Amino acid sequence: MKTSQLLYDPVIHKLKLLEEHDVTPLLNELSAPKKPTIVGFLNQHGYNLIQQDERARRHFLQVNYLLRDGIGIKLACALNGLEPGANLNGTDFIPALIEHALHSERGEQYQLFAMGTCEPWTSQGASALFGGRSFHAIDGFQPLEDYLQFVQQHLEPGKIPLIVMGMGMPRQEEVAVRLQRQLGRPALMICGGAILDFAAQRFNRAPAAIRKIGMEWAYRLLMEPRRLFARYVIGIPQFFYYIVRNGRDGNVDVSEQGAYNRKS
């Protein structure tokens, strides 16, 4: 459904926007990948990154399923005449997706990988997400090529790789795109930000009431002001500048590969 449109931002129009009743069909679809498939999330921070780094834009927008995460993108959708639908933030959606996939008809075919953060959080988070099933884990501070080799070395014939990447934006999107090119089989790659840390309970979630009104970012800023000051206090005004600039600039397009570009 569309609302009254003030702007047209091609990046926002690339989102897969869903209502709550569409979530279960999406989980079914993602649980039966027919090719190497990337799931990712666009929030205010990610939107800023893809304005500032051309390579990040290219990788980020090659994600097959780019989902709306947060109140900032909700407002951007409204300005672009789009019904924002459900807020599919990764911290809630990813555990639901993994549980759904592992209990689907293909559940026993999945081979599980976790990439990101550092030990013991990598293994603790993976164990929580994967329900105690066996998995292969590697921290998030290795050269990019090491992740490609890590997956290739551990792949088993006939298995479907399910790879959770918790390296943060935009590195995890770059790794996912490289793996997508390398894997010649169905696979599910999930760009999860701090999902392994949250699953390991390294960081606390905001109370449910705060999450419900879309203000978890403010809670996180309060808990980690030094680390998140630039992301939110500086980043939020930047975000609205980019939204308005891109929505009004006729020299903006999206290539067939999904990359955001500015025409010369």
Regions found by a protein language model. Give the residues of each.
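N-terminal nucleotide/polyanion-binding subdomain common to many enzyme families
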Residues: 1-94
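A short helix->loop->beta-strand "cap" motif at the edges of active sites that frequently abuts
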Residues: 36, 107-110, 184-187
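Short glycine-rich anion-binding loops that position phosphate/pyrophosphate groups of nucleotides
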Residues: 43-47, 167-172, 195
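Short, conserved loop/helix-junction motifs that constitute active-site signature segments
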Residues: 57-61, 104, 181-185
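Conserved beta-alpha
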Residues: 73-154, 158-159
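A transmembrane-helix-recognition feature enriched in membrane-embedded lipid enzymes
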Residues: 74-77, 205-258
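Short, flexible loop segments at boundaries between secondary-structure elements
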Residues: 139-146, 185-223
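A contiguous pocket-lining binding segment that forms or flanks enzyme active sites
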Residues: 147-186
